[in-house]
Amino acid sequence: MWKVVAADDEGYIREALKKLINWEKMNCDLVSVLEDGQELIQCIENESPDIVITDIQMPGVNGLEVCKYLYETRPETQVIILTAYSDFDYAKFAIKYNACEYVLKISIMDELPEALEKATGKLTQLKKEIEKEESAVSEQRTLLQQIDQYVEQNFKNKISMNYM
């Protein structure tokens, strides 16, 4: 399951996130719902979530600052901006810092599941790419170990590149 943390300063939105979204169906585990950006950053450091859902306007650290922080420190983390503002400058900032999706609160029940599906799809693709790269590295490591072993066993003999 993908680990999700969320932050919104409005209590009814926090409750909606906890109770109205079928997280298990989305293959997600909502591990924490917080009320400000500073708590969210602390939680990100402790929990290492795969997906972060954040409101824009919150006390202390706002959601756009959280988005920028994740872009700079944990670029693989998928960010979903949840906001009451359809302001183009906010959307532009979110795009600049690689937010996965921008969801308006008035359509949270319709758009958030789609945004989560998009985020989990990106994470699944990223995981496959990492596994593929790790497999290639492992194969190269095995080949280098075989070459090293051969050279160690035969270093006193004449070895030409043609022979190898």
What is each residue range found by the language model?
Residues 4, 30-31, 79:
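Hydrophobic/aromatic residues located in beta-strands of well-ordered beta-sheets
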Residues 25-35, 43, 91:
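Short hydrophobic/Thr-rich beta-strand motif most characteristic of the beta2 strand and flanking loop
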Residues 11-32:
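Two-component/phosphorelay signaling modules centered on CheY-like receiver
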Residues 42-148:
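CheY-like receiver
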Residues 2-13, 17-18, 52:
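Conserved acidic segment of CheY-like receiver
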Residues 144-164:
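DNA-binding recognition helix and immediately preceding turn/loop
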